[in-house]
Amino acid sequence: EGFAELRIPIVKDRPFFYDLTANGAVRVSDYSTVGTTVTYQAGLVWAPVADFRLRGTYAQAVRAPNIGELFAPSNQTFAFIDDPCAFDSRDNGSDTREANCLSLLQGLGLTDAQIAGFTGDTGTSLPGLSTGNIDLTEETAKTLTFGAIFQPTFIPGLILSADYYDVEIEDAVATPSANTLLELCVDAVSLDNEFCANIDRTPVGGGFDPADAGVVSGFTLQPKNVAAFSTKGIDFSARYRVPTEKLGIFNFSFVGNHLISLETQGTPGADIIENAGVLGDPEWQVNFDFNWTLDNFNLNYGINYADKTLRFSRADIAADPDIVAPEYLKVDSRFEHDVQLRWTTDSNMSFYVGVNNVFDQEPDVGLYFDPVSALGRFFYAGIRISGDDLGF
């Protein structure tokens, strides 16, 4: 692995150009599994005045598949098959599905009459294999960010910032289900694809029952570079530090995120799913912390907020508008308060007590971790002793 970084001051101390600086970096990595990868980033920072600056960055990053995704041993698994080549399913996919199914079944020796009435029904849970995939390649992420920082000299200790981000991940690693493999196989342009290679079918004369001709006899589930993700949002923060002569130091911190979109596509051609605002991915999250230090004492009070989220995916709600009573459609917002008091001795030994979830907010109906943990209000106390305190 090797890398290089570059910083180029372009203009400085000029009207409307207090600072203009370009920066860039490149990294080349050679993996024994996926070979050579290249990542890079380029950015620009412009400060028209000393108190205010704009910044932007474009970057490409990669993630090499991990050891489990590559080399997981084979294990048996089971699945119920819904064959896309059944006579009543051939027109429910891509424009090439019907032609591919005909070619596939003819290649197995089925007659026109058998193909016309083919159901693909195995009548039972079908055994298959789950294993790693040594042919995986790296995931690639492309990121665009731009934002602003305001640090006014007339209000010492105040820092305001906001950054917009746009991230797209291609060739993401995911493991298609058995039924998804079947659909991807025949919905592709041709049958010469990696998905068909993971499906076994019984040729004419190859089974104990003539009715098994053409039926799926086995499958192999493997991680593949088939998924895609994208997200957009805004990170924002405000920090204010107020030192005083007699009352100690006050620190205020306000950090948040607005999730504009979070789209996932599990496999090529699959529906794009919007997850922003769905359980686990709130559109708004904010953390506020107040910290006060006076001599050896420190007090911290924190508030963690997340807005309401849908209990079910938008696709599930669209398919069944009455999936749940209206009052349970959304999970309550999180408004958790935490407090801690710490005393540190002159020898750096510290004692602390605190309460998490001060007002004992509970999880929503039917949930254990949303919007808060089922643990409820939590009291704790402790002591921290370093080796120096013990004389070694």
Label every PLM stretch briefly.
Residues E170, I260-E263, N304-A319, R342-F392:
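C-terminal beta-signal and adjacent terminal beta-strands/loops
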Residues G68-L160, F219-I234, D281-E283:
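Outer-membrane beta-barrel signature, preferentially recognizing the C-terminal barrel domain
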